[in-house]
Amino acid sequence: MPLKVVFMGTPDFAVPTLAEIVGSGHEVVAVYTRAPAPAGRGMALRPSPVQALAERFGLPVRTPATLRSEEAVEIFRGHDADVAVVVAYGMILPPAILDAPRLGCLNLHASILPRWRGAAPIQRAVMAGDSETGVAVMRMEPGLDTGPVAMLERVAITPEMTAGELHDRLMPLGADLMNRALGALERGGLTFTPQAAEGIVYAHKITNEEARLDWAEPAQRLHDTIRGLSPFPGAFFMADLGRGPERVKVLRASLADGRAEPGTLLDAHGTVACGEGAIRLLRVQPAGKGPMEAGDFLRGRRLEPGARLA
């Protein structure tokens, strides 16, 4: 018998999972998502990707500012759901919400738990130079991503893969994994295993300070940082482009050979000396501009070999 599902999600990452659930015949009784937010040059209110899809499906959408009020809890209980599916919703679920669905709340998390619990698991895995990550379906508890895991799918992180590319790889895998988990739950065959007590690492939110490239660091670490922060928020350096220091994001780079004072531009191809080794800039985005090839950027800004990048 199809399950009655409350879906809770907000960004692009959650969209394929909602589509899979609808397509598999489960009854989505409500979709919870973050409220429309200002976006674009005109800062007009724009609904979340999940809300846009839910409205195309004709599903009821709720965008509460809080889930902690008595009214919000009663409305949630009124859905009489078998299960809630949570994918990057963006709000903490209080115990009263976690306890409301008959079969609990399932969360799709983008890591091999317990490694990279928290807000930025995809970016942190790439920034750390991990060789693999994955997606996991777990039962939610009051703790941060501490619940027992039902299903796990592993994915290799290739040496040049960016966080954006990994995000796009994990989206359909996660949707399929959650769909299979719901099928097992419907049949009464979904089992859970407690997370290991060892290997717990937290994926804290990315700060602006750690997005700035420190050329004194080893090239491998900088390369991993660039990959992990591409395309958003973007690792960056500062350069004097004729109008004072300006921020330049690095969207793609590769490891290279070279030695000089860290931050020195070594050639016209965009090779920059690091504390150990060097990296070659491949694709950059100056402030207020679109992405461009690093060679075009260097020629246009007249940055010559020997220039220092801060």
UniProtKB/Swiss-Prot annotation:
A GO molecular function held by the record: methionyl-tRNA formyltransferase activity
Keyword Ion transport in record: no
UniProt keyword terms in alphabetical order: Protein biosynthesis, Transferase
Database matches in SUPFAM superfamilies: FMT C-terminal domain-like, Formyltransferase
Enzyme Commission number(s) from the entry: 2.1.2.9
Entry keyword Protein biosynthesis: yes
NCBIfam families listed in its UniProt record: fmt
HAMAP family: Formyl_trans
Purpose of the protein: Attaches a formyl group to the free amino group of methionyl-tRNA(fMet). The formyl group appears to play a dual role in the initiator identity of N-formylmethionyl-tRNA by promoting its recognition by IF2 and preventing the misappropriation of this tRNA by the elongation apparatus.
Protein name per the record: Methionyl-tRNA formyltransferase
Organism: Methylobacterium nodulans (strain LMG 21967 / CNCM I-2342 / ORS 2060)
